[in-house]
Each structure stands twice: as structure tokens, then as C-alpha cells.
Amino acid sequence: MRRGLLFFGLFLISLVIIYMEPIWSYQISPNDGQELPLQSPPPTSLNLESIPTQGTAQWIGQPMKAFSTLYGEAQSVTDSGFGFFRHQFRMDADAFMEVTTINQRITSIKVLGETPMDIGPFKYQMSLEELTTYTVISPIVSVEYGGETYSLELMEDDINYRPLVAFDNGSYAILFFDHQDKRSGLYSLMYLDTETLLKLAPYVLTEGQPQFFVAEKAADWITIDEQKSETSRYLMQQLRRSYDFPAYSTSLALQRETQALLTDFLINQEDYLSTERLRSYQRIQRQELNQNWVLTNQEVRTLVEELDEEKTFAHFEMPVYDPIFTLLSWYSNPYLVSRLFYDESEAIGVAFSKENMLVLFQEINQPTESSEQP
């Protein structure tokens, strides 16, 4: 009897060893991170490791005055309404830079095109494979803020289109990749501090309490919303040109129509949303969750049903605290790219109401005389 039990026990142990061996080997294998095709996940590490600080990353946390002394004054400085200011530098038709500050300290820098900023060790149009020669991309990011530990998780699309890099001065960079044939590779970067990273929430928060930007009650929201609309149209035109697509047509009539549609949606949400969807919107509006909320395809059709549905497409998103960051995310979003890379002539309207953003796209046969390029 004892021999039988001993034999049975040894048999079970052998089965466990045989079954678990490939799993243990997988966990400790040093060769897991192999280079994969461009749109497959690149080599990853379980935890994000920082790289030496260089280039633009050195400016995060520094005084805006020192930055302006070296690079000149911004063409415009505007209030975001969410506790930070936006300093915009429009170099030429192909270059754009925006610096955000809190109390005159730099919290983020976004660069697009050939600006004076040093983006080393990165370079424009580099591939994900090239990025892995400088750092190993991690799906798990742990950060310290306010004495607390926060964990972020990057999904597959994040790793392919918006990977995160950490520098040893405590700053970060979101790298925006485009996988279209016309211009494949890195096309824009956003350098930012920990607070901005947590509040913009570009990745899933898996540990720690969500952090939020708070709308300022005393802010001049009419002016702020108009400024954000103009900036968004400007950047969308710039990105449009970079792909050699026809410039968007814009008109005061379409802009007013977009604003009126956004206002109607915010006032009469029960006409457009189911009870469940309305509750989900309200939860995010009350800042119970820190994640993006967008209209579904069916909700978009309901929203634009009084317009020419065959020629009109709408995209609504909230919360949008930083329009430039949001737009850069759209252009590296595999689900929005079919609309943004539509190569026929279109008119656009862009409207804001605090953290709510609506964009209307309307097909047109040819540019009209009212076309402009804000």
C-alpha cells in the first residue's frame, strides 16, 4: 500500500515538472524580446527602465524664462482653463511646438516637424525596431507621485503607436508613430512630467488613485474654447499638408453649425444616448473614472441625422484637456486613421465646450472660395 502511494506521489510530481517546465523556461528566457514586424509588438520588458536624460527632456521642470531666452518668445500664450498655460511656437508650414507651464515651470513640450529642439537619441521617421536600440519598451510602468506609487499598463496599440520612454531626471516622452505607407515611423513627441502623465491618462491606470485636471470656474471659457478650436484647426491643416492631402475647407457657417450641434448634444443628451451610455458619460464627467469617452457609430448617425449623413462624419470625445495631445493621439490611432487619411476634399468644423470636443467632417466636391487655412 505504501509503495503504491509513493509511486502515485512520484508520478504526480513528474507530471507537474513536465507540464510546468516550458512555463518556467518562458519566464526566465533571456531571448523573449525578439524583433517583430513593424505593426507587431516590439521587444518589451516587464518594467520600464529609464535612459540617460538628453535633448528636450532636460527642459521638463525648468523655468519658462530660461527656455524663452534660448528659443525666443512664443507667438501666443493662452490659458487652458485647467490650471496650465499653453505657449505656442509656429515655426513654418511643417513645424510646430507647444510648451505647457504651471507657475512658469515647464510641464510638457510637444514637437512636430523640424523644430530647433533636440529630440535625441530619437529621430523622425525612425521605426519601432530602431527605438529598441535605445530602450526596451515596457507594457508596465510604475511611477512615484505625491508619495504614492502608480502603475500604468500599455496595451498593444499603445506599444505600437504611442510607446512611453522614461528619462533618469524623472521626465517621460510619449513617442507618436505612424504606420501609413506615405510616412511611416516616428512623427511627433511629447515630453512631460509625472503629474501631466497621470492627469492626461494616455494609458490604463492599474494601481493608485486617478488624478484629474480641474476646470477653473472663473476662467473665460468662451475665449478659451475659441482659442482651442483655432489651434486644433491649425494643427489638423498642418498634418493634412504633411501627407499631401487637399487642405481642409473651413467656413464660419460650418463652424457655427458644429458649435450648435455640440451645444444641443450637451443640453439634450437623453435624446442621443441610452440610459446606460448617459450614466457612463456622467461618471467620467464627475471624475469617477479617468478615461476617454467617445460617441459610438450609431450615436454619431443620430447626432448628424439632420445633416447629409452620407457626406458627414462626426467625432466627439471627452475629456479633452490638451487638444494638441489629443490630436496627435488621433493621428496615431488605428481606428480613426481611415477618416483622418481620407484623401478627398473635405470641410471641417471644430468646437469645444470646456473638456468636450466635437469635430465635423463634410465631403465636398472641390474647395470653395470661402476656404481658409487657419
Regions found by a protein language model. Name each.
Residues 210-216, 367-374:
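Intrinsically disordered, low-complexity repeat and linker tracts
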Residues 222-292, 296, 336-337, 344-348:
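Short, well-ordered surface patches within globular domains
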